[in-house]
Amino acid sequence: MDTFQVIILALIQGLTEFLPISSSAHLILPAQLLGWEDQGLSFDVAVNTGSLFAVVIYFRNELWAMFKAWIASMVKGQHSDDSKLAWWIILATLPAVFFGFIAKDFIETHLRSAGVIAVTTIVFGLLLWWADKMSRRDLTVYQTGWRKALLIGFAQALALIPGTSRSGATMTAALMLGLSRDAAARFSFLMSVPVSLGAAILVGKDLAESPLPIDFQALTLGTVISFVAAYLCIHYFLKIISRMGMTPFVIYRLILGAVLCGFIFL
């Protein structure tokens, strides 16, 4: 890949990973518009790692508090709001791990198409709009509970379908279950840590076994750009939804879905 391609794809990953607008929908656009080939496994690992670093550093205080409380809950039997939240995040991760393991090959073979991505981008955009407008939205992350956490986890598993958007599906479910916009976003972001870490380990294992050469300069640049873009995205997204809700992202998803349909059918 040339430098321009690295910059564009890393920006797309960083900006779309944590917004409810589907990163997979955006990653196929350069291929459609510019005829770019697949960026490769090593680049996917690099930009995903950059996004993972961004959410870990942004929520470092919350994650550290949760980790300490989680350890205390196991070692000393001391339970607190942070330890409960940590257990809920772990519980919410399990459905994606299970369904990802059994359905990975089917999804890669049958669902990773522009048509599927276009439809899911539109459909789940409308569901996000409904959840944002019709739900109660007054619970904090510490009021989630294990049942709601598990249901949000199933929504995350549903996001294995390309175009759904992991953050979009989890925020939609959280809003439907009564979490506030800020709480829905924060729970979704915290959920991304174990999922992204697990995915990076699995893909990294495949990469280590691959005989293909590695362009370390491109990977380093992609990681840094993805990190910066994702960090800024998280920061400003939390500010935007507190003022404007999810409507701007719903409108954007509908437009994006229409554009993808145009590429497919015109």
Swiss-Prot record:
Topology of the protein relative to the lipid bilayer: Multi-pass membrane protein
Gene Ontology cellular component list: plasma membrane
What sort of enzyme, by top EC class, is this? hydrolase
The primary location reported for this protein is membrane
Provide a GO biological process annotation. Answer: cell wall organization
Q: Subcellular location, in the record's words?
A: Cell inner membrane
- InterPro entries to which the protein is assigned, alphabetical: UppP
**So what family is this one in?**
Belongs to the UppP family.
Name the NCBIfam families for this protein: PRK00281.2-4 (NF001393), undec_PP_bacA (TIGR00753)
User: Further remark, if any?
Assistant: Bacitracin is thought to be involved in the inhibition of peptidoglycan synthesis by sequestering undecaprenyl diphosphate, thereby reducing the pool of lipid carrier available.
Name of the featured protein:
Undecaprenyl-diphosphatase
